[in-house]
Amino acid sequence: MGAALGTGARLTSVPRIACSSLRRQAPSAPAQGCHSKSGPPRPVPLKKRGYDVTRNPHLNKGMAFTLEERLQLGIHGLIPPCFLSQDVQLLRIMRYYENQQSDLDKYIILMTLQDRNEKLFYRVLTSDVEKFMPIVYTPTVGLACQHYGLTFRRPRGLFITIHDKGHIATMLNSWPEDNIKAVVVTDGERILGLGDLGCYGMGIPVGKLALYTACGGVNPQQCLPVLLDVGTNNEELLRDPLYIGLKHQRVRGEEYDDLLDEFMQAVTDKFGINCLIQFEDFANANAFRLLNKYRNKYCMFNDDIQGTASVAVAGILAALRITKNRLSNHVFVFQGAGEAAMGIAHLLVMALEKEGIPKTEAIKKIWMVDSKGLIVKGRSHLNHEKEMFAQDHPEVNSLEEVVRLVKPTAIIGVAAIAGAFTEQILRDMASFHERPIVFALSNPTSKAECTAEKCYRVTEGRGIFASGSPFKSVTLEDGRTFTPGQGNNAYVFPGVALGVIAGGIRHIPDEIFLLTAEQIAQEVSEQHLSQGRLYPPLSTIRDVSLRIAVKVLDYAYKHNLASYYPEPKDKEAFVKSLIYTPDYDSFSLDTYSWPKEAMSVQKV
């Protein structure tokens, strides 16, 4: 071993994907933006040793390090004298996980694993995405955010406050990774259906980016979660001694806007104009405004508006295969008129226009109910978004009355009002139409407009149901069993992000979210529809995300949105070459020898 080191040995890692600081196996297609062919992988020195390796979640393998690796990395003796495969480590984690009584405890186990061993964390998630998604994201992540101060273990992500204005570029330089391709940012004002959680909202960007990798295969080292802390108006948090954020009322107005402007500019200055920035859980007052302000200037989108719209429209398009008619034959009533409702409505209008329906006629098919009743022309204090969908109709106060008058084919709940779809509403829907569409999309489960069981029972199994949070299968008295579809945004944003990153897309038009919806709907088989599913099983989500990414990439090149040239001939192979794998890196010595005469020792 000593002789090997003396002949030019370097400690390296054998790579498995591109864009990593470690040496990995060459991908089937190059991951560089130029798309040029690369030669054989060259050794890259691994500079970390000892505790710096075992405490680095990107490098740590726990007891999966071989004896040779332990000796060369200076960690022999720092790990128990046992050698485990990743499969055995997975089994060990699963046994401990299954012994936990609460979902919050399970969440904590997974997050601490992510902090300790990133590869094993994603091996666990990808082993059963359907099982773990409700834990790492909705609905459990909402509970985790509410208890963030109590469960806080280790900082993850970048916390930028209103007091850091003027210095955001410096703060970004503190982040240990330079090759960031995706940022998820929130200001914590509207976390799921739970309201203002301030700094506790960091759990959302962390959870979203975990799904970027688990569902889409985006390299986690290229992802950055960000919390913009401008204060909180949640009095309970302001009184909480465990609260980890700024303890003052939210800063608004020009100072807030200046912070956002500086943040967007600093991110693109540091990581490039192609860096994807996903806005998450901003309040209605800011969500639309910031989307309209930045969408044509930066590579960004708002998941609550555009992601929710895409997954909801995907469910509706799949439902058309059950109702056996066209989108233009349907009338929609929304419970809620916030960012999610408006996003869905706008994308529905686009889909209707694609069917040949004029925009003015398409808008007439969409009725919205907010806290003050039906949105109608002439009603005071309507913002620009609501004015677009205001109907020429007398005022109506309740959702039940609107449903009776309009007789919609579909009702869509996105207002986080638990139980809003009453038995009377469901009975009316079932009496109006043979196959009524009922989407209870609010998160978390406690905020759902109705349960799957209630919908199927009241409509005698004729309701076409989808929800935002997961519900178990329902068996009716006649023996029929339905498996409700979950309209989870995770069907959308990982694939879109992967496609955007792959093509270096500068701006993300709404057409990308419509083609994503169409692709998701195509993934639903007739067997799934017969079971009540409007979405493909979550177990297939990585394959779905890959096909979405390829569609996005193809659209980008056809419409001159991509910035990487030349265009890859085999887009699927190219995207596959970028996908992160949770397989462990193999650390090895890069050994070689000089010619004997070159190594001869000179003597006096």
Swiss-Prot record:
InterPro entries: Aminoacid_DH-like_N_sf, Malic_enzyme_CS, Malic_N_dom, Malic_N_dom_sf, Malic_NAD-bd, Malic_OxRdtase, NAD(P)-bd_dom_sf. Gene3D superfamilies: Malic enzyme, N-terminal domain (3.40.50.10380), NAD(P)-binding Rossmann-like Domain (3.40.50.720). It comes from the Eukaryota. The active site is at residues 137, 208. The record marks 304 as: Important for activity. The keyword RNA-binding does not apply. NADP(+) binds at residues 190, 304, 443. One of its GO terms (molecular function) is malic enzyme activity. SMART domains: malic, Malic_M. Residues 28-50 are annotated as: Disordered. Its main location: mitochondrion. Divalent metal cations. Prefers magnesium or manganese. GO terms for cellular component: mitochondrial matrix; mitochondrion. It is found in: Mitochondrion matrix. Disulfide bonds: none annotated. Belongs to the malic enzymes family. This is NADP-dependent malic enzyme, mitochondrial.
